[in-house]
Curated annotation (Swiss-Prot):
Protein known as: CD82 antigen
Subunit structure: Forms homooligomers. Interacts directly with IGSF8. Interacts with EGFR. Interacts with VEGFA and PDGFB. Interacts with ITGA4. Interacts with ITGA6; this interaction reduces ITGA6 cell surface expression. Interacts with ITGB1. Interacts with TLR4; this interaction inhibits TLR4-mediated signaling pathway. Interacts with TLR9. Interacts with PLAUR.
Organism of origin: Homo sapiens (Human)
UniProt KW Cell membrane keyword: yes
Pfam families reported in the protein's UniProt record: Tetraspanin
Extracellular side: 33-53, 111-228
Gene from which the chain derives: CD82
């Protein structure tokens, strides 16, 4: 009966560590995505915000360590090596404490992140240059076109751009242009566009722009909240797997009475 219980515990621990390994790969992939994505609002933030870049490196580091721990846990469970199981438990405890600490720091710095985000976008709009090729500008054009918004708080944010407001005709940001429901084109127009049929009108007045009037702040924050929900779900899932792994490793470790290093696989 006892040996059967140990065998069940051993293979359950192996299964949990396999899931743990996969979740570690997901966390690592998320960190790589933050650094590599060049076509969404994440690109705007990570290019200008050292905090987000640092967070991406933390995700990559935690993901890599989690995968390593999952691998070591599988070896320790299958071969019933007591020292590996004890080391595995200690590392799991440290990772769990680090995750809780990082989550708390992120939660209490949400206000600072939102403020930093607004400053980044406002500066980007003010310094936008239609004649310059810039990946950051392209990313913001993509956001405005896909989210169907204009500016940060409202389209009036674009009145801070000197190049745009010095145009003699009615000119507006191309990516802000209102599109019909039937227009499902994925291409994004960049730079500034002149409104048709306004050659005789003097001055560039924002009220005449055929653009979305709603700012991107609320929509982007909603998008971030949705993605944060995914991150939170993954984090909770990892924490549950970690706790189960800790419990199972202790149970198995208690039943392994003697150290037998001959069970450790030779590579």
């Amino acid at each position: 009966m006892g040996s059967a219980c140990i065998k069940v515990t051993k293979y359950f621990l192996f299964l949990f560590n396999l899931i743990f390994f996969i979740l570690g790969a997901v966390i690592l992939g998320f960190g790589v995505w933050i650094l590599a994505d060049k076509s969404s609002f994440i690109s705007v933030l990570q290019t200008s915000s050292s905090s987000l870049r640092m967070g991406a490196y933390v995700f990559i580091g935690v993901g890599a360590v989690t995968m390593l721990m999952g691998f070591l846990g599988c070896i320790g469970a299958v071969n019933e090596v007591r020292c590996l199981l004890g080391l595995y438990f200690a590392f799991l405890l440290l990772i769990l404490i680090a995750q809780v600490t990082a989550g708390a720091l992120f939660y209490f710095n949400m206000g600072k992140l939102k403020q930093e985000m607004g400053g980044i976008v406002t500066e980007l709009i003010r310094d936008y240059n239609s004649s310059r090729e810039d990946s950051l500008q392209d990313a913001w054009d993509y956001v405005q076109a896909q989210v169907k918004c204009c500016g940060w708080v409202s389209f009036y944010n674009w009145t801070d751009n000197a190049e745009l407001m010095n145009r003699p005709e009615v000119t507006y940001p191309c990516s802000c242009e209102v599109k019909g429901e039937e227009d499902n084109s994925l291409s994004v127009r960049k730079g500034f566009c002149e409104a048709p049929g306004n050659r005789t009108q003097s001055g560039n007045h924002p009220e005449d722009w055929p653009v979305y009037q709603e700012g991107c702040m609320e929509k982007v924050q909603a998008w971030l909240q949705e993605n944060l929900g995914i991150i939170l779900g993954v984090g909770v899932g990892v924490a549950i797997i970690e706790l189960l792994g800790m419990v199972l490793s202790i149970c198995l470790c208690r039943h392994v009475h003697s150290e037998d290093y001959s069970k450790v696989p030779k590579y």
